[in-house]
Amino acid sequence: MYKRQLRWQAAVFGFSAHTLDVRQNSEVVTRVLENIWSINGTFHEIGSEGWLQQVKSELIEPNLPILDKSELNDESFEILSRLELIFKIQNGPDPDAVGPFILSMTRSAADIFSVLLLARYAGFGSEKLSLKVVPLFETIEDLDKAPDILRQVYDFPIAARSLKDADGFMEIMLGYSDSNKDGGFLCSSWTLDKAQRAIARSLSENGVKPKFFHGRGGSVSRGGAPTDLAIAAQPKGTLNGTLRLTAQGEVVTSKYANVGTAATQLELLSSSVLHHSGLTNVSAVDPEAEDVMEALSSLSQLSYLNLVNHDDFVSYFNEASPVDELSLIHISEPTRLLA
């Protein structure tokens, strides 16, 4: 009996017990590529059409220039070494030990192409790269641009081959905290809803289904909500029998602190996803209701920005809230996040 359980555990979990995702900011990726190109020769202005075309032309180049890592700065050396390690793990005895490369603050197709190009410099193949890049769209503006960004990605064959998995899915991560800070609660919630529907339509044009990774926190301001209600609120056609979400800070303790609560939470999560994925009578958003929500979203964002951009808001917030006292508590995340 013990051996049978051990075999089951090995079959389900492998030898690493869990998969570790890798996460990096798009600005760091851009700086690394800039450093490489400054060594190899000239390059165009960051963010320009010339920059995009240079990334794409190198990405399809069969033989890239040999890179001398000793000439790189510390940041670039670390990122390239990390990608080389990912490649080594993927080709080792337990390839599932490392997960996707999550690209935070994805703002353009060039950001996604740049990660793939760095992967090529790190030794990944030239026809189809095994590095699964997961774009993380976080701000209101980037969520609005996401469908067009993904269209550009799937118009480029090597990226299309690399980002679509064997089951026809592409993983996309959605940022709740930053979109909330960017536009307020109502604007953020509505923009995330619209973005999921638009991304699903964009991917379907290329025969791809979305696998959404929800970067939720515990509080309402960070997308926190009861698990079953949060899943029930997902737009039609966006679940597809699969869902990923983050569990941060106090959520880990409240939902996964012991075997009983963890089992209950996982049962609720899986049953809710299966139930709502199988619903066929979910109606589409009514156009009139969509117009109303669009107007409310715009008004709420304007009101929110008028508040947080007020000259006295920061001093008022510091006086009216226990933020300084909270900074003395050693919890999961810092009290203040610096840009």
Residue ranges and their predicted role:
Residues 292-300, 307-327:
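Active-site phosphate/pyrophosphate-binding segments
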Residues 122-302:
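Catalytic or ion-translocation cores adjacent to nucleophile or general acid/base/metal-coordination motifs
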